[in-house]
Amino acid sequence: MSSSQSLRLGVNVDHVATIRNARGGDRPDVVRIALAAIAAGADGITAHLREDRRHIRDSDMARLKAEIEKPLNFEMAATAEMQGIALATQPHAVCLVPERREELTTEGGLDAAGQYNALAPFIAKLNDAGIRVSLFIAADPRQIEAAAKLRAPVIEIHTGGWCDAVVEGDSGKADAEWRRIVEGAALARSVGLEVHAGHGLDYATAETIAALPEITELNIGYFMMGEALLVGIAETVRTMRAAMDRGRATLKTRTA
């Protein structure tokens, strides 16, 4: 596990595939964008193979695994089909997420506590295969404690509620959501979990959350793909990396 001083950037390439699939064919190339992001400083690539294949395809996952040299984080629902694909692909990590066909994006965290009995053998099989398992959950003590009992080594805190409140200018809700994240990250580390965060992050919120010492990785996609349309993927990655570094630098100042 990385030290608390380091912070990795995982770039989610799902919406490269969304643009590609709007017209069909193979352009823009998901793997080409992933390689460009890595060349610009991304520490890993995240891709979500949904059950309905609305953006990432099975062939994208296979190519990403074969062609990128940085860690591949395979987001997926906890289904037998996806488990089989993950075991065949052997990504660095799997992040288990809830999934509903009618949603536009992942709307909430996984109910690790409520689905404990189903998730326990599912996670154990991935662990036994040498795949790191992450659970995408809300910063809820009940869910965090369930993740630890399930022997998932990593959680990814769902930051969507906080990010949405920040963008909407709802300071009361933003403050409440932020407190949940801060307290959740501290609890997760105290029970031995590695803590990642993602969903809805932009330059400003990434800089803010980078100052939390418990967080070791941010996974960011939609915002970065939108920025890349304006300035290119390399410049977007460099700007995001700089924002994260500024946030992390405040941690070093506090602990100096």
UniProtKB/Swiss-Prot annotation:
3-amino-2-oxopropyl phosphate binds at N12, R23, G200, G221, Y222. 1-deoxy-D-xylulose 5-phosphate binds at D14, H15, R50, H55, T105. CDD domains: PNPsynthase. GO terms for molecular function: pyridoxine 5'-phosphate synthase activity. The keyword Cytoplasm applies. It holds the Pfam family PdxJ. InterPro entries: Aldolase_TIM, PyrdxlP_synth_PdxJ, Pyridoxine-5'_phos_synth. GO terms for biological process: pyridoxine biosynthetic process. Its EC number is 2.6.99.2. Keywords: Cytoplasm, Pyridoxine biosynthesis, Transferase. Pathway: Cofactor biosynthesis; pyridoxine 5'-phosphate biosynthesis; pyridoxine 5'-phosphate from D-erythrose 4-phosphate: step 5/5. It comes from the Bacteria. Its main location: cytoplasm. The active site is at H48, E75, H199. One of its GO terms (cellular component) is cytosol. It is found in: Cytoplasm. The record marks E156 as: Transition state stabilizer. It catalyses: 3-amino-2-oxopropyl phosphate + 1-deoxy-D-xylulose 5-phosphate = pyridoxine 5'-phosphate + phosphate + 2 H2O + H(+). Homooctamer; tetramer of dimers. Belongs to the PNP synthase family. Catalyzes the complicated ring closure reaction between the two acyclic compounds 1-deoxy-D-xylulose-5-phosphate (DXP) and 3-amino-2-oxopropyl phosphate (1-amino-acetone-3-phosphate or AAP) to form pyridoxine 5'-phosphate (PNP) and inorganic phosphate. This is Pyridoxine 5'-phosphate synthase. It comes from Nitrobacter winogradskyi (strain ATCC 25391 / DSM 10237 / CIP 104748 / NCIMB 11846 / Nb-255). The lineage of its organism: Bacteria, Pseudomonadati, Pseudomonadota, Alphaproteobacteria, Hyphomicrobiales.
